[in-house]
């Protein structure tokens, strides 16, 4: 599938960074951990008892994308993706659109507001030569702890209900949806295949198959796929 060339800004598909130092913050334990010889970069954390100024100028946004035009264009992309699937070129394709907007927020302030509006297990903020990357995701790409490889496929979702009873109803509806379940099983199979390329023979297993995790605004079907890493395989 060719790379799209009419993007409104350039950002490479991959950025490899050899960071001098990085910071990890556990929101559950409220613990900062600094790694690297240049941990002095994070000395400001010693002042983390100072209140954050929430009286700053209210955020403003101006959308530069023609949403109507993008919606019409997206329909054509869907049809093209179906052709790729029918021809056997792809098993799975993720379609996306680029939304560009101007704002008076710096990236760190945007990250802070994002963490309040959409708290997720995996949030990140890091600068690159092409721009700052900020994100909020419920899903890991891959976790390697010791010799264990872990992937947690997420596919299938419903919004959170207005109360506990509606949450239960939506969860049951989600788990009985043939399309959502088929998509999730496909991702579990892909995760098993991916881990199997680097794991010891016979060590790949699936646990907690198709359980539902609830987040602030949405619920997802999640499974856990594990394997024991071969001795000749590194995290890279």
Regions picked out by a protein language model, each given a short descriptive name:
Residues 1-236:
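Extended alpha-helical targeting/anchoring segments
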């Amino acid at each position: 599938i060719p790379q799209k060339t009419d993007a409104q800004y350039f950002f490479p598909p991959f950025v490899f960074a050899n960071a001098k130092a990085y910071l990890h913050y556990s929101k559950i334990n409220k613990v900062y951990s600094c790694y690297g010889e240049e941990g002095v970069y994070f000395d400001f954390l010693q002042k983390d008892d100072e209140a954050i100024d929430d009286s700053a100028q209210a955020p403003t946004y101006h959308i530069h994308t023609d949403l109507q035009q993008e919606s019409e264009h997206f329909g054509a992309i869907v049809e093209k993706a179906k052709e790729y699937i029918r021809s056997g070129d792809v098993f799975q394709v993720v379609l996306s659109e680029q939304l560009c907007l101007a704002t008076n927020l710096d990236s760190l302030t945007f990250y802070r507001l994002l963490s309040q509006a959409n708290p997720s297990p995996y949030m990140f903020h890091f600068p690159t030569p092409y721009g700052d990357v900020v994100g909020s995701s419920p899903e890991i790409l891959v976790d390697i702890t010791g010799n264990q490889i872990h992937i947690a496929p997420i596919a299938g979702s419903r919004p959170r209900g207005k109360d506990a009873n509606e949450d239960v109803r939506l969860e049951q509806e989600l788990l009985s949806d043939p399309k959502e379940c088929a998509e999730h099983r496909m991702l579990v199979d892909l995760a098993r295949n991916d881990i199997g390329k680097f794991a010891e023979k016979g060590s790949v297993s699936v646990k907690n198959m198709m359980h539902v995790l609830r987040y602030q605004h949405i619920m997802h079907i999640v499974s856990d796929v594990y394997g024991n890493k071969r001795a000749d395989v590194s995290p890279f």
